[in-house]
Amino acid sequence: MTETPFWQRKTLDEMSDAEWESLCDGCGQCCLHKLMDEDTDEIYFTNVACRQLNIKTCQCRNYERRFEYEPDCIKLTRENLPTFEWLPPTCAYRLLAEGKNLPLWHPLRTGSKAAMHAERISVRHIAVKESEVRDWQDHILNKPDWAE
């Protein structure tokens, strides 16, 4: 008999730090820069990748020291999760907080990121290097329906 996966038997608050970290599918969507309108606080999504994001692997080059390299890097925690309304509907943290299960392509279910990349969930097919961008406003993406 197989054991029920931890994400189905524990709440987000009950998970260990290692379990919490493993929920991240590594899609890189958090690592794309967002612009905020100073007057309306509206968030605009771009395809501009953080300098630390390896676009091919969708992994941070310096994850353990990312805040030293990128002071504006976000740290998603159990406490601040509700404030990140811009998280995509595919995000495991968002899904589990909403009482949903992980999608079939999630690396915790498949054992690899290949299915996630094949489903085009990751940013590897849209991300551009920050160093190659002159005007970030030229890289604003159409607002996803889920971000309404």
Swiss-Prot record:
This is UPF0260 protein ESA_01462. Belongs to the UPF0260 family. Pfam families: CxxCxxCC (PF03692). It comes from Cronobacter sakazakii (strain ATCC BAA-894) (Enterobacter sakazakii). NCBIfam families: PRK05170.1-1, PRK05170.1-5, PRK05170.2-1, PRK05170.2-5. Disulfide bonds: none annotated.
